[in-house]
A protein has these predicted regions:
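Mixed-charge, polar/low-complexity N-terminal
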Residues: 12, 20-21, 25-27, 32-33, ...
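Membrane-proximal basic amphipathic "stem/tether" segments
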Residues: 1-67
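Glycine-centered flexibility motif
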Residues: 41-43, 87, 190
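A sequence-composition feature that detects small, non-aromatic residues
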Residues: 14-16, 25, 30, 74, ...
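Internal hydrophobic scaffold segments of catalytic domains
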Residues: 3-14, 100-134, 182-204
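Weak global preference for isoleucine
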Residues: 15, 22-26, 39, 93, ...
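Phosphate-binding site of ATP-dependent enzymes
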Residues: 110, 136-205
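A conserved helix-loop-beta module that forms one wall/lid of the active-site cleft
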Residues: 48-138, 142-159, 166
């Protein structure tokens, strides 16, 4: 016998998803304010922004969409040209290939392990430890869906919508069979202020 509560919860989730989509389309600002309130339990002040997190929302809505350099640096492929231009080519992770579709990839030419990423989004990644164990059908389906996704529209981060969707395959960086410790430096007004250390990551990159 089916669980009526489960059906009710699925229905409520479907309604919530539909409402989020409608609010995003009608008023991205209203959506971001609702999202901010839900996550932080604070009202989102944008005129002017006061909290650091409010300033991030202001940039997301009103500044980044007008600055092509933000899209340039957010793109996983395009940012490589910028890094090279700035003289830091030695800091780039080696790339095995850049592709416009999954079916362009010649897996026989790739090493045993690597990382596959979409150029135009965050979180659209797949870590491959052993290509012989890959479920190519599942990967193909996943990346075809990702490449068709307008990530900027999905997340209300419009600068992502300017990035050409591609698949980039990079060398897998690992330490003793695990992902390495990641260090993120937060820079404010040109000065490094905070160090964020990420450890114990699984498949989420």
């Amino acid at each position: 016998m089916s669980n009526p509560n489960l059906k009710e919860n699925k229905f409520k989730r479907a309604i919530a998803v539909s409402l989020r989509g409608i609010i995003k389309a009608i008023s991205p600002v209203a959506y971001v304010k609702c999202q901010y309130r839900y996550i932080t339990h604070h009202k989102c002040h944008l005129n002017p922004p006061v909290r650091y997190t409010e300033k991030l929302q202001y940039l997301r809505l009103f500044v980044y969409p007008k600055d092509d350099n933000v899209s340039l640096c957010a793109g996983r492929v395009s940012v490589r040209d910028y890094v090279e231009y700035r003289g830091y080519v030695d800091s780039l992770i080696p790339v095995y290939g850049v592709y416009n579709s999954f079916d362009e990839i010649d897996f026989s030419s790739l090493p045993k392990s690597f990382v596959m990423k979409c150029s135009h989004a965050s979180g659209f990644n797949e870590i491959v430890w052993d290509k012989d164990a890959m479920d190519l059908s599942a990967s193909r389906k996943r990346f075809k869906k990702w490449l068709k996704t307008d990530y900027g529209k999905k997340t209300v981060e419009p600068h992502y919508s300017k990035i050409h969707p591609q698949i980039i395959i990079e060398k897998l960086l690992e330490e003793d069979g695990a992902l390495p410790v990641e260090y993120k430096i937060h820079v404010f007004n040109g000065k490094a202020k905070n160090l964020y250390v990420v450890t114990g990551r699984g498949e989420d990159i």
